[in-house]
């Protein structure tokens, strides 16, 4: 065994051994317990960042630990390879997105391998390859024929300069991010998944996921947004509107119906269109609303604006005339594009009514009383007894709901209804680098799905987009085709699918990545699925995780999988954060400096109190800790860390610095500490091995001192097993190993028993570290005399008899203050303990001249003598 620990050599040797033996390639083994551990696959952006390293290390520690428990562990990896960044990079560098993507995958794969991850690379999937997306197209055609996918007009952000559709996040202050042109709202035909058909099940089966963080389940519940309410119809005022009809609204607060003082409609509503005829000012306002953001989050924060129409509707119960307003806060796609406004009990209506001097009528007695003041109070939105509501006065929320519903049903002007916030999922993207939508538009037959024997519809890979619309729409060689039904000239769909589609089923494809008879091989899929442990960032809590759950149910209903949910347990890892440093630039902006280029000064408590740039020695401002990012220039390159310290040190630091679900603050001194610790383990093992391996430990002949050492070893095994196995608290498990190392380094090395005990301790340390620092553990295990590789060793078991203590040390307090210690046999009675405590030399000094009133004994811990 080399005297010096050289991570580069140790890690290369371990990785070569794993590659040669294909240590992580798994097959279905009926009868052996499976464990499917999956980290969210990366987008091949070019380089791994520390967030990736943390995510994949957490997954790897769990996978390796489960393997040590004797399970058949699947840990695959792939590439979420379609998407806009590739198009943007392609335009910037004048290179085809395919070339850019495949080069990035090659580089990032070598980076992942250098981390020593226990990945079955034979199952690698790349979503931009036809052998992957052909099955997505196959499922699309099946679902289209069943009506689960349909086509309708949808509102999009249209950039008139680039002639393209922009995502909400590409619209900055109403302008296109690339062209700077004012964005228009456009209606274009798009394809939609009927996810709303599954809304109830998606909501209810969250209760089948006890292994998910409550926070994520709450976010999904809110996103699905089930609300029970009432559909209320306000009859048209024929004098102003000119014809019969009713305005439908949905409300979750029908108890406040008697407080409605106006109604508001969306800019796209037919009543808005009618009112704008011959009213140029109203038409201009409607156009302004239509050009605003279509994102709900923006709507919530934007200024509430409205304009009166000359139209009125009638209150369904009183017949009173209520004015119709057009308002920018009403969404056409929620409810029916209209709301009844109750300013006294809804904050948004309250703001709007105050802005435009509309009446406010209180109809609920709240904790703030019967009246509503000029400033909004949260209490105004409470449920309470009805007032100013005629026959409904005195009723509570439920009583009013039922009575008002009955009154509306009698007049045929309302009924109770369940509503969801969730909308159907529009998947059409006017982009090039995505999965082609397998539809042919025929002038006679309409939309015809591409027949199975003509799949995949292959995306041409030698295209460099220019940002002006989709290049596919300008490629007759791509879109010109014949109708599969009637044989006439037809046109292929040039939109591609939302890239969330690829990541909604990849976890199932890993079970049979080379299967060529369907989306998945049902036998293999049901062998591995559902995923036992899924690991990824909280930012995917809603969209990705909801779409993946939806797709799993689609696959189940197609007979491909039998389970209801894709991921049994979910771990959302925290961010990696680091210090930021900047100087204010001449233009008022900030120039950010990488922490590696900054010299810092700390106070006695290690708090940073000053910072200077290394190049010029001048001060820089301290910006505080933030998530590692390019924009703040506070990232640390994982590759340089691996080259400097080795992968095991990086892995150890990341697992020790914080629990996996909390933010991890990068610290160079922490990395140094991890490196020092591994060198200590190596040194102790090297000195031990150099003397030749010892014989068997004779447990029956251990001295008291040796029993204490062995107790420390097995206490650490017990605690680490709980920390890793039950709670994923790798940081506290590592702390246990460090405690044992402190004991082993001080342990005497005189007798054969001493050396045999150290052997047991070093083996325990090696096994406990094996999932976290696999390379050094691989070498240590070999040097400690084992022929079988550490990856095939089992997790250490606790010898409970080693934890039994013959004697215990109790602290003795007098009136709550520590005054001494007594060592007692573990089986000593309460009376014996009390007598020993009273007669302790130091205790006698502090009780001299006092009367002992009471003695409290806490077995195994302390004795408190109360005296005065």
UniProtKB/Swiss-Prot annotation:
It catalyses: tRNA(Leu) + L-leucine + ATP = L-leucyl-tRNA(Leu) + AMP + diphosphate. Transmembrane segments: none annotated. The keyword Cell inner membrane does not apply. Its EC number is 6.1.1.4. It is found in: Cytoplasm. GO terms for cellular component: cytosol. It is an enzyme of class 6 (ligase). CDD domains: Anticodon_Ia_Leu_BEm, LeuRS_core. Keywords: Aminoacyl-tRNA synthetase, ATP-binding, Cytoplasm, Ligase, Nucleotide-binding, Protein biosynthesis. The keyword Aminoacyl-tRNA synthetase applies. ATP binds at residue 630. HAMAP family: Leu_tRNA_synth_B. Belongs to the class-I aminoacyl-tRNA synthetase family. This is Leucine--tRNA ligase. The lineage of its organism: Bacteria, Pseudomonadati, Pseudomonadota, Gammaproteobacteria, Pseudomonadales.
């Amino acid at each position: 065994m080399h005297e010096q620990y050289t991570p580069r050599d140790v890690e290369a040797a371990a990785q070569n051994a794993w590659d040669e033996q294909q240590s992580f390639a798994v097959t279905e083994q009926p009868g052996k317990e499976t464990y499917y551990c999956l980290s969210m696959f990366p987008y091949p952006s070019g380089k791994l960042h520390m967030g990736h390293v943390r995510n994949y290390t957490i997954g790897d520690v769990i996978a390796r630990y489960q393997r040590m428990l004797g399970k058949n562990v699947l840990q695959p990896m792939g590439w979420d390879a379609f998407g806009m960044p590739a198009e943007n990079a392609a335009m910037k560098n004048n290179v085809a997105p395919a070339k850019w993507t495949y080069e990035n995958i090659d580089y990032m794969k070598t980076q992942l391998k250098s981390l020593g991850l226990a990945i079955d690379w034979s199952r690698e999937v790349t979503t931009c390859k036809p052998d992957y997306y052909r099955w997505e197209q196959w499922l699309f055609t099946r679902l289209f024929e069943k009506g689960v996918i349909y086509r309708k007009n949808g509102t999009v952000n249209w950039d008139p300069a680039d002639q393209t559709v922009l995502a909400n996040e590409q619209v900055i202050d109403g302008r296109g991010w690339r062209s700077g042109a004012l964005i228009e709202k456009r209606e274009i035909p798009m394809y939609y998944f009927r996810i709303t058909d599954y809304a109830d099940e998606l909501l209810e089966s969250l209760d089948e996921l006890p292994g998910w963080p409550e926070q994520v389940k709450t976010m999904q519940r809110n996103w699905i947004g089930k609300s029970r309410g009432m559909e209320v119809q306000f009859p048209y005022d024929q004098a102003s509107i000119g014809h019969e009809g009713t305005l439908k609204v949905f409300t979750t607060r029908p108890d406040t119906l008697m407080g409605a003082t106006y109604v508001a409609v969306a800019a796209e509503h037919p009543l808005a269109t009618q009112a704008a005829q011959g009213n140029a000012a109203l038409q201009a306002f409607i156009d302004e609303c239509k050009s605003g953001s279509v994102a709900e989050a923006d709507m919530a924060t934007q200024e509430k604006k409205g304009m009166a129409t000359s139209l009125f509707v009638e209150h369904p119960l009183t017949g009173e005339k209520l004015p119709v307003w057009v308002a920018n806060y009403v969404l056409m796609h929620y409810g029916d594009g209209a709301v009844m406004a109750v300013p006294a009990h809804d904050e948004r209506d309250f703001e709007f009514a105050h802005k435009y001097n509309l009446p406010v009528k209180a109809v609920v007695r709240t904790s703030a009383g019967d009246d509503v003041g000029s400033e909004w109070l949260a209490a105004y939105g409470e449920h309470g007894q009805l007032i100013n509501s005629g026959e409904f006065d005195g009723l509570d929320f439920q009583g009013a709901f039922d009575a008002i519903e009955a009154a509306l049903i009698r007049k045929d002007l309302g009924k109770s209804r369940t509503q969801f916030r969730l909308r159907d999922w529009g998947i059409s993207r006017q982009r090039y680098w995505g999965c082609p939508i397998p539809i042919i538009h025929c002038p006679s037959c309409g939309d015809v799905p591409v027949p199975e024997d003509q799949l995949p519809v292959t995306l041409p890979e030698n295209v460099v987009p220019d940002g002006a619309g989709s290049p596919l729409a300008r490629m007759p060689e791509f879109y010109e085709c014949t109708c599969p039904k009637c044989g006439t000239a037809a046109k292929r769909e040039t939109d591609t699918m939302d890239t969330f589609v690829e990541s909604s089923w990849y976890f199932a494809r890993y079970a049979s990545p080379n299967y060529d008879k369907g989306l998945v091989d049902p036998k293999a899929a049901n062998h591995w699925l559902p995923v036992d442990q899924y690991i990824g960032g909280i930012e995917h809590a809603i969209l990705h995780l909801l779409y993946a759950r939806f797709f799993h149910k689609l696959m189940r209903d197609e007979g491909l999988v039998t389970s209801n949910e894709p991921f049994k347990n979910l771990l959302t890892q925290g961010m990696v954060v680091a210090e930021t440093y900047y100087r204010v630039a001449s233009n008022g902006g900030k120039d950010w400096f990488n922490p590696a280029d900054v010299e810092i000064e700390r106070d006695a408590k290690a708090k940073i109190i000053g910072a200077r740039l290394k190049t010029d020695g001048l001060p820089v401002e301290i910006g505080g800790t933030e998530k590692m990012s390019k924009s703040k220039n506070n990232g640390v390159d994982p590759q340089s860390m691996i080259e400097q310290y080795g992968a095991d040190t990086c892995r150890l630091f990341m697992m020790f610095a914080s629990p996996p679900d909390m933010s991890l603050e990068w610290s160079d001194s922490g990395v140094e500490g991890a490196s020092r610790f591994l060198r200590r383990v190596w040194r102790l093992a090297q000195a031990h091995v150099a003397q030749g391996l010892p014989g068997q430990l004779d447990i029956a002949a251990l001295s008291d001192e040796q029993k204490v050492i062995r107790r420390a070893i097995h206490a650490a095994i017990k605690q680490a097993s709980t920390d890793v196995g039950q709670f994923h608290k790798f940081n506290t498990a590592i702390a246990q190993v460090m405690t044992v190392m402190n004991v082993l380094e001080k342990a005497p090395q005189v007798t054969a028993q001493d050396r045999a005990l150290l052997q047991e301790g070093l083996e325990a340390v090696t096994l406990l570290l094996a999932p976290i620092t696999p390379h050094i553990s691989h070498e240590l295990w070999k040097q400690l005399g084992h022929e079988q590789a550490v990856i095939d060793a089992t997790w250490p078991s606790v010898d409970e008899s080693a934890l039994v203590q013959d004697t215990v040390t109790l602290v003795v307090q007098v009136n709550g203050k520590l005054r001494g210690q007594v060592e007692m046999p573990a089986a000593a009675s309460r009376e014996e303990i009390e007598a020993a405590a009273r007669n302790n030399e130091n205790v006698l000094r502090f009780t001299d001249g006092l009367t002992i009133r009471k003695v409290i004994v806490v077995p195994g811990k302390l004795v408190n003598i109360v005296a005065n």
